[in-house]
Swiss-Prot record:
It holds the Pfam family Ribosomal_L27. The gene is rpmA. InterPro entries: Ribosomal_bL27, Ribosomal_bL27_CS. Coiled coil: none annotated. Residues 1-21 are annotated as: Disordered. This is Large ribosomal subunit protein bL27. One of its GO terms (cellular component) is ribosome. NCBIfam families: L27 (TIGR00062). HAMAP family: Ribosomal_bL27. One of its GO terms (molecular function) is structural constituent of ribosome. One of its GO terms (biological process) is translation. PANTHER family: LARGE RIBOSOMAL SUBUNIT PROTEIN BL27M (PTHR15893:SF0), RIBOSOMAL PROTEIN L27 (PTHR15893).
């Protein structure tokens, strides 16, 4: 006979890996072409001048310049890259 009760099982004990979303280059910082500016889920912030968007909604710099955040059409946030 067992001297202790069985441990049983649980349906918990899992966790997903972190996705590291958010702003990677702050407003006013100088970036090179191809630099990731921010990672997001969905198009919360849209790309503006000299900024591109990836298939996972990542915004990146198309040219060297300074990062600026602003409100665009319909008060939507936008990221621009202003040439120095």
């Amino acid at each position: 006979m067992a001297h202790k009760k069985g441990g049983g099982s649980t349906k918990n004990g899992r966790d997903s890996n972190p996705k590291y979303l958010g702003v990677k280059a702050a407003g006013g910082s100088t970036v090179a072409a191809g630099t990731i500016i921010l990672r997001q889920r969905g198009t919360v912030i849209k790309p503006g001048v000299n900024a591109g968007i990836g298939r996972d909604h990542t915004i990146f710099a198309l040219e060297d310049g300074v990062v600026t955040f602003r409100n665009g059409r319909n008060n939507k946030k936008q990221v621009d890259i202003i040439a120095p």
